[in-house]
Amino acid sequence: MCDSQALANEAASEDQRTMIGRLFRRSPDPGGRRIARTPPDTVVWAIGDIHGCSDLLRVLLRVILEDVAAHRPQRAVLVFLGDYVDRGPDSKGVLDTLCELSAHREIDVHFLRGNHEERMEGFLVQPDLGPGWCEYGGRECLGSFGINPPEAGDPPELWEEASLRLNLALDPRHRALLASQKASVAFGDFFFAHAGAEPGVPLSEQDPK
Protein backbone atom coordinates (compact mmCIF):
# COMPACT_ATOMS: atom_id res chain seq x y z
CA MET A 1 0.00 0.00 0.00
CA CYS A 2 1.41 3.42 -0.97
CA ASP A 3 1.92 6.09 1.70
CA SER A 4 -0.86 8.31 0.33
CA GLN A 5 -3.37 5.46 0.46
CA ALA A 6 -2.31 4.57 4.00
CA LEU A 7 -2.79 8.19 5.07
CA ALA A 8 -6.20 8.30 3.41
CA ASN A 9 -7.27 5.14 5.24
CA GLU A 10 -6.00 6.52 8.55
CA ALA A 11 -7.89 9.78 8.00
CA ALA A 12 -11.08 7.90 7.13
CA SER A 13 -10.74 5.77 10.25
CA GLU A 14 -10.25 8.89 12.38
CA ASP A 15 -13.35 10.47 10.83
CA GLN A 16 -15.33 7.35 11.70
CA ARG A 17 -14.06 7.41 15.28
CA THR A 18 -14.95 11.12 15.62
CA MET A 19 -18.45 10.54 14.26
CA ILE A 20 -19.07 7.56 16.55
CA GLY A 21 -17.61 9.41 19.53
CA ARG A 22 -20.29 12.09 19.18
CA LEU A 23 -22.91 9.45 19.87
CA PHE A 24 -21.56 8.97 23.39
CA ARG A 25 -21.85 12.62 24.43
CA ARG A 26 -24.37 13.14 27.21
CA SER A 27 -27.55 14.96 26.17
CA PRO A 28 -29.04 17.68 28.39
CA ASP A 29 -31.85 16.65 30.72
CA PRO A 30 -35.18 17.58 29.04
CA GLY A 31 -36.86 19.07 32.10
CA GLY A 32 -40.41 18.03 32.86
CA ARG A 33 -40.32 14.78 30.93
CA ARG A 34 -39.82 11.30 32.32
CA ILE A 35 -36.45 9.94 31.28
CA ALA A 36 -36.03 6.25 30.54
CA ARG A 37 -33.19 4.88 32.61
CA THR A 38 -31.00 1.82 32.81
CA PRO A 39 -30.51 0.02 36.14
CA PRO A 40 -28.22 1.86 38.61
CA ASP A 41 -24.54 1.93 37.68
CA THR A 42 -25.29 0.21 34.35
CA VAL A 43 -24.38 1.51 30.91
CA VAL A 44 -26.04 -0.10 27.89
CA TRP A 45 -24.99 0.15 24.27
CA ALA A 46 -27.16 -1.23 21.44
CA ILE A 47 -25.87 -1.93 17.94
CA GLY A 48 -28.26 -2.47 15.04
CA ASP A 49 -27.90 -4.20 11.69
CA ILE A 50 -24.25 -4.94 10.87
CA HIS A 51 -24.87 -6.84 7.62
CA GLY A 52 -21.39 -8.15 6.97
CA CYS A 53 -19.55 -4.84 7.52
CA SER A 54 -16.79 -6.16 9.76
CA ASP A 55 -14.54 -3.12 9.25
CA LEU A 56 -17.13 -0.67 10.57
CA LEU A 57 -18.00 -3.04 13.41
CA ARG A 58 -14.39 -3.10 14.58
CA VAL A 59 -14.20 0.71 14.55
CA LEU A 60 -17.38 0.95 16.63
CA LEU A 61 -16.25 -1.68 19.12
CA ARG A 62 -12.91 0.06 19.58
CA VAL A 63 -14.71 3.28 20.55
CA ILE A 64 -17.02 1.42 22.95
CA LEU A 65 -14.16 -0.43 24.64
CA GLU A 66 -12.25 2.84 25.02
CA ASP A 67 -15.34 4.39 26.62
CA VAL A 68 -15.62 1.45 29.04
CA ALA A 69 -11.95 1.79 29.97
CA ALA A 70 -12.28 5.55 30.50
CA HIS A 71 -15.45 5.54 32.63
CA ARG A 72 -15.31 2.12 34.32
CA PRO A 73 -19.06 1.57 34.82
CA GLN A 74 -20.00 -1.02 37.42
CA ARG A 75 -21.80 -2.94 34.68
CA ALA A 76 -21.31 -2.48 30.93
CA VAL A 77 -23.89 -4.13 28.67
CA LEU A 78 -23.71 -4.47 24.90
CA VAL A 79 -26.82 -5.58 23.01
CA PHE A 80 -26.59 -6.61 19.36
CA LEU A 81 -29.98 -6.26 17.71
CA GLY A 82 -29.53 -8.89 14.99
CA ASP A 83 -28.84 -8.99 11.24
CA TYR A 84 -25.14 -9.71 11.53
CA VAL A 85 -24.89 -11.45 8.16
CA ASP A 86 -25.79 -10.93 4.47
CA ARG A 87 -25.43 -8.05 2.00
CA GLY A 88 -22.03 -6.78 3.16
CA PRO A 89 -18.74 -8.38 2.09
CA ASP A 90 -17.61 -10.09 5.31
CA SER A 91 -20.32 -11.94 7.23
CA LYS A 92 -17.75 -14.47 8.41
CA GLY A 93 -15.53 -11.69 9.75
CA VAL A 94 -18.48 -10.22 11.63
CA LEU A 95 -19.26 -13.58 13.26
CA ASP A 96 -15.57 -14.04 14.11
CA THR A 97 -15.43 -10.61 15.76
CA LEU A 98 -18.63 -11.22 17.73
CA CYS A 99 -17.32 -14.58 18.93
CA GLU A 100 -14.14 -12.91 20.20
CA LEU A 101 -16.17 -10.18 21.91
CA SER A 102 -18.43 -12.67 23.68
CA ALA A 103 -15.40 -13.81 25.70
CA HIS A 104 -14.66 -10.23 26.84
CA ARG A 105 -14.89 -10.12 30.64
CA GLU A 106 -15.54 -6.41 31.05
CA ILE A 107 -18.76 -6.36 29.00
CA ASP A 108 -22.00 -8.30 29.34
CA VAL A 109 -22.83 -9.16 25.72
CA HIS A 110 -26.28 -10.17 24.43
CA PHE A 111 -27.13 -11.29 20.90
CA LEU A 112 -30.64 -10.94 19.48
CA ARG A 113 -31.80 -12.89 16.45
CA GLY A 114 -32.55 -11.01 13.24
CA ASN A 115 -34.47 -12.18 10.19
CA HIS A 116 -31.22 -12.61 8.24
CA GLU A 117 -29.88 -15.06 10.81
CA GLU A 118 -33.17 -16.95 10.53
CA ARG A 119 -32.72 -17.15 6.76
CA MET A 120 -29.17 -18.43 7.06
CA GLU A 121 -30.06 -20.99 9.71
CA GLY A 122 -32.99 -22.14 7.59
CA PHE A 123 -30.65 -22.78 4.66
CA LEU A 124 -28.43 -24.92 6.88
CA VAL A 125 -31.23 -27.48 7.30
CA GLN A 126 -33.32 -26.83 4.19
CA PRO A 127 -31.15 -26.24 1.10
CA ASP A 128 -34.12 -25.46 -1.15
CA LEU A 129 -34.42 -22.14 0.72
CA GLY A 130 -31.12 -21.11 -0.87
CA PRO A 131 -32.40 -19.21 -3.92
CA GLY A 132 -34.67 -17.00 -1.83
CA TRP A 133 -31.96 -16.41 0.75
CA CYS A 134 -29.41 -15.44 -1.90
CA GLU A 135 -31.80 -12.84 -3.31
CA TYR A 136 -32.09 -11.53 0.25
CA GLY A 137 -28.34 -11.07 0.75
CA GLY A 138 -27.17 -14.63 1.35
CA ARG A 139 -25.02 -14.67 -1.78
CA GLU A 140 -22.52 -12.33 -0.14
CA CYS A 141 -22.65 -14.33 3.08
CA LEU A 142 -21.76 -17.57 1.30
CA GLY A 143 -18.96 -15.80 -0.55
CA SER A 144 -17.42 -14.65 2.72
CA PHE A 145 -17.05 -18.33 3.68
CA GLY A 146 -15.38 -19.12 0.35
CA ILE A 147 -18.51 -20.75 -1.07
CA ASN A 148 -19.54 -19.97 -4.63
CA PRO A 149 -23.35 -19.82 -4.50
CA PRO A 150 -25.38 -21.56 -7.20
CA GLU A 151 -27.79 -19.68 -9.43
CA ALA A 152 -31.55 -19.69 -8.91
CA GLY A 153 -32.24 -22.23 -11.65
CA ASP A 154 -29.43 -24.63 -10.79
CA PRO A 155 -30.15 -28.27 -9.84
CA PRO A 156 -31.09 -28.95 -6.19
CA GLU A 157 -27.89 -30.95 -5.78
CA LEU A 158 -25.81 -27.78 -6.09
CA TRP A 159 -27.82 -26.08 -3.35
CA GLU A 160 -27.45 -29.15 -1.16
CA GLU A 161 -23.69 -29.01 -1.68
CA ALA A 162 -23.60 -25.29 -0.79
CA SER A 163 -25.63 -25.97 2.36
CA LEU A 164 -23.28 -28.78 3.35
CA ARG A 165 -20.24 -26.58 2.79
CA LEU A 166 -21.71 -23.81 4.94
CA ASN A 167 -22.45 -26.34 7.69
CA LEU A 168 -18.82 -27.42 7.56
CA ALA A 169 -17.53 -23.83 7.47
CA LEU A 170 -19.34 -22.78 10.65
CA ASP A 171 -17.05 -23.65 13.54
CA PRO A 172 -18.24 -24.42 17.11
CA ARG A 173 -17.86 -20.77 18.15
CA HIS A 174 -20.18 -19.61 15.37
CA ARG A 175 -22.76 -22.24 16.29
CA ALA A 176 -22.58 -21.34 19.98
CA LEU A 177 -23.18 -17.68 19.13
CA LEU A 178 -26.16 -18.51 16.90
CA ALA A 179 -27.60 -20.79 19.59
CA SER A 180 -27.31 -18.00 22.18
CA GLN A 181 -29.50 -15.57 20.23
CA LYS A 182 -32.61 -14.28 21.99
CA ALA A 183 -35.82 -12.69 20.71
CA SER A 184 -35.59 -9.75 23.11
CA VAL A 185 -33.94 -8.45 26.25
CA ALA A 186 -34.74 -5.64 28.71
CA PHE A 187 -32.61 -3.48 30.99
CA GLY A 188 -34.33 -1.01 33.26
CA ASP A 189 -36.84 0.99 31.21
CA PHE A 190 -35.39 -0.16 27.90
CA PHE A 191 -36.75 -3.08 25.84
CA PHE A 192 -34.65 -4.32 22.93
CA ALA A 193 -35.85 -6.43 19.99
CA HIS A 194 -34.84 -6.73 16.37
CA ALA A 195 -38.03 -5.52 14.71
CA GLY A 196 -39.87 -3.67 17.46
CA ALA A 197 -42.98 -4.56 19.44
CA GLU A 198 -46.69 -4.79 18.68
CA PRO A 199 -48.44 -1.66 20.03
CA GLY A 200 -51.01 -2.35 22.72
CA VAL A 201 -49.64 -5.79 23.57
CA PRO A 202 -47.79 -6.18 26.91
CA LEU A 203 -44.12 -6.92 26.42
CA SER A 204 -44.48 -10.18 28.32
CA GLU A 205 -47.09 -11.33 25.78
CA GLN A 206 -45.29 -10.34 22.56
CA ASP A 207 -44.99 -12.96 19.83
CA PRO A 208 -41.26 -13.49 19.12
CA LYS A 209 -42.10 -13.52 15.40
Where on the chain are the PLM-derived regions?
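Feature recognizes metal-dependent phosphohydrolase scaffolds
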Residues: 2-209
